[in-house]
Each structure stands twice: as C-alpha cells, then as structure tokens.
C-alpha cells in the first residue's frame, strides 16, 4: 500500500502542472468570512471559457479558493488520467477485501485445523513476505497481534450452539473497534526473521507430535493387524477346499454303494474320513461293523464312531453308545455314564433310534427309571416308531412308569398293529381271546403272556422291523445299519441287497 501511495504522490503533481502548485486554501476568520492569503498568486489564474465574466468571478470571494482550483484542474487534467487513478485504487481496495475474505473462509472450507497452524493462511503469508515493508501500517492493521490468541472457527461453524449456550454473553474473541485500533497502533514492531522462526518452531512441534502419535512399533502392529485377516482368509479357503474334497469323496462312495462296488466305496469313505469329515467317518464305521468292502472289525468301527461322535454326529453318538452298552463285560462305570450321556444328546436332538433305545434301557438295571422310560418311549412313538408304540402299550398294561390303564394299552397296540408291528398284533389277539374266555381268566393268565420291554425286543427294531425314516442330511448308509441279513463277508450276495440299494439314494448330501 505504501508503494501505491508513493506512486500517486509522485504522479499527481506532474499531472496537475506548475500552475496548481502555488494554490493554497484561503484561511477562514472567526466570523466566517474568507480572507485572501498574501502568498496566493491569484493573478496567475485565467479562465478562457469564462470570457468577460472571469474578472467578476475572480473578484467574488465565494468563487475563489478550492472551487476555482478544482475548475482549473478539471480543465487542464485529462479525464482518462483521473479515471485510471480511480480504477486502480478501486481494484487495490477490492483485492485487499478479497484477500481478507479468503483469509477468514479458507479454514472453513478445509475443515478444522490445529491451533498452531490456524494463522498460516494465504493472506498471512502474503503480508509476511519480503514484498511488504516490515513496519508498514497496512501490515499492522491486517495481521493479528502476537499476544492475541488465534481465532477459532467453531463459533462460525456452530453459531446456534454458541447462541444457545451463551445467549447474552458477548463474544470474547472479537474485541471492540476502539480497543482493536488502540491495540493495532501499539503493536510492537517485528522483524521478518521472527516470523520465520515462529514458522520453524511450529513445524518442529507438529512433527514432534506426529512422531509421538505414531511410534516406530505402531506401524509394525498395524502391519500385523492387516496381515491377520489375510491369514484367516487363506486358512478359511483351505478348510473350505478340504471340506469340498471330502464331500466329493463321500459322494463317490455312496454312488459305488448303489452300484454294488463296496470295496471302492470303502476306499472313498476312508479318504474322506482321513480329511476329518464326520459323515464319512460314520460311514467307515458302518462298513467296519458290518464287513462291507473290508473285513469286519468292531473295535475299529467303535473308533470311527467315536471320531464322528466327537464332532456332534447324532447317529455316530447313538451307534458308539450302543456298541459300548452291548458289551458290558469290559465297560467301566465312567464309560457307561459317557455312553448314556451320548445317548441323551442324540435323543434330545430328535434322533428316534436313540429315544427308543433309552426308553428300553431305563426299564432295566442298573439304569432303571420308569418315568424317564415312558418319556422316551412316548417321544419315539410320536416320531413314528411302531416298536416304541408297542412298548408304551406294555407300560400302560403293566403300570410301569404310568398309571395302569388297559384301554390305553389296547389303543397303543392297535396303533402299532396298524403300522405293521407284528408283536402288537399278536398281543391284541391274545387279549381278545382272554376277554372272550372271561374276566377271571384274564386276571390269571393275561399278564403272563408277555414280558416287559427288553433289549432283545429292541434288536428287532434295529433289524429293520419299524422302518424308521432318516434325514437326507445325515450322510449315513441308510438301512445298512438296521439290516439283520448282512453277512460278514464283503463279496457274498444277499436277497436284501436290492432293498438296501434303494435306500441309498439319499446318501452323502448335506
């Protein structure tokens, strides 16, 4: 700005000419009348345009002074020169206002900035440069005071919140006009080196804070954290691939079972079981137990049943517990309790075979519990097991775990007989014959014609008499585990093979 004022000061006297330099304003007396200064050479003024009236106007005190000087200047100065001076001055003022607006609105557009960098705006750097004199008045009036805190833009960004919190309190960051002017006039002079030192110190402080916020070990921890999800993803893909291969081998085994190639089927089951697939492990146990595609080995079958049972396979849990409980000579108490616990897990999961086995098991020592026996028999009968329905009729007829009710027993026998249960039909014929002979004969001989539920009668259930349905997602060998006509040899044909093959359509899926 001081350069602009200097240029104007040197240009205007040259434009006005030597005739205007001697003109000075008339002093005004106390009574309001104007007096002519003796140093003002009015005789040098001449107006060509005024004509004869020029002498009259020069002698009129109201027309003398600055008014005559203005008319004389406007007559001798070119209008283009005045227009250029006004235009350049206006552009300079607009440029300063524009820079000031950029100074205040740039932090709002860029978002919140740290306090130590809030004054590093374009206007601040522009006025701090070497182009401007360090002691200029424009620099003092535009740049903030060094002892004044940096203005915060939170009040501009959230005016409503500030007004709600302090509706009557005046703004503390914006001083009044008089205090601002007095403070700017008393602003101490600073050298350009001070600004450079201030910038360097603030840059160093920001770099130190950044170094504290990101220690050397933090980058390694972030790299490790990014590497962990990648390793987990790779592991998941590998596990999925292994599972897909195991499912494929198990499916090929079931297809070979349908074609009668038990050796190839057992080989595929073994490959899938080696990859930890529970359904294939269960199928290997079935082949080992019944000698299909491999010599019969009950101990190995129990081992594979146990491997599948640990993974939660309900049929494997049932077969493993059943094999243990059917060999009580070498079974210890902890193993017996473990077998019963696995049976309960399978029965609670809805497996009908486990429910029927527990219903009979709880009618015998050392697991005698008549109420629980009736409970599990009722569950198995509700799931469509005709043998459990027949056993439930025996409990009602004898009063085992339930109140004795011959009518309810006959109803259970009829339901089991309608489902094709032959023992229920025989019991109904016996009851009808005794009833025809007389009530007294029923009381003496009726209860001696049958015995309570036993594991021997349960073997009929396991031999396939009830035809229990199997879910297609179990991946088992269908009725192979319930066929009583399967031999130990893996090459001998059997009459029951066609029905067995028809039951293998749902294998290996899920």
From Swiss-Prot:
The record marks 141-142 as: Cleavage. Residues 169-181 have a biased composition (Polar residues). GO terms for cellular component: cytosol; mitochondrial inner membrane; mitochondrial outer membrane; mitochondrion. InterPro entries: ISR_Activator, Sel1-like, TPR-like_helical_dom_sf. A motif (SIFI-degron) lies at residues 307-326. It comes from the Eukaryota. GO terms for biological process: DNA damage response; extrinsic apoptotic signaling pathway via death domain receptors; HRI-mediated signaling; positive regulation of mitophagy; response to iron ion starvation. Residues 46-61, 155-167 have a biased composition (Basic and acidic residues). Residues 19-61, 142-185 are annotated as: Disordered. Keywords: Apoptosis, Cytoplasm, DNA damage, Membrane, Mitochondrion, Mitochondrion inner membrane, Mitochondrion outer membrane, Repeat, TPR repeat, Transit peptide, Ubl conjugation. Residues 1-23 form a transit peptide. SUPFAM superfamilies: HCP-like. Residues 35-45 have a biased composition (Low complexity). TPR repeats lie at residues 213-245, 246-278, 279-313, 314-351, 352-385, 386-423, 471-499. GO terms for molecular function: protein serine/threonine kinase activator activity. The keyword Repeat applies. Signal peptide: none annotated. Residues 24-101 form a propeptide. Interacts with DAP3. Protein kinase activator that acts as a key activator of the integrated stress response (ISR) following various stresses, such as iron deficiency, mitochondrial stress or mitochondrial DNA breaks. Detects impaired protein import and processing in mitochondria, activating the ISR. May also required for the induction of death receptor-mediated apoptosis through the regulation of caspase activation. Belongs to the DELE1 family. The TPR repeats bind to and activate EIF2AK1/HRI. This is DAP3-binding cell death enhancer 1. It comes from Mus musculus. The lineage of its organism: Eukaryota, Metazoa, Chordata, Craniata, Vertebrata.
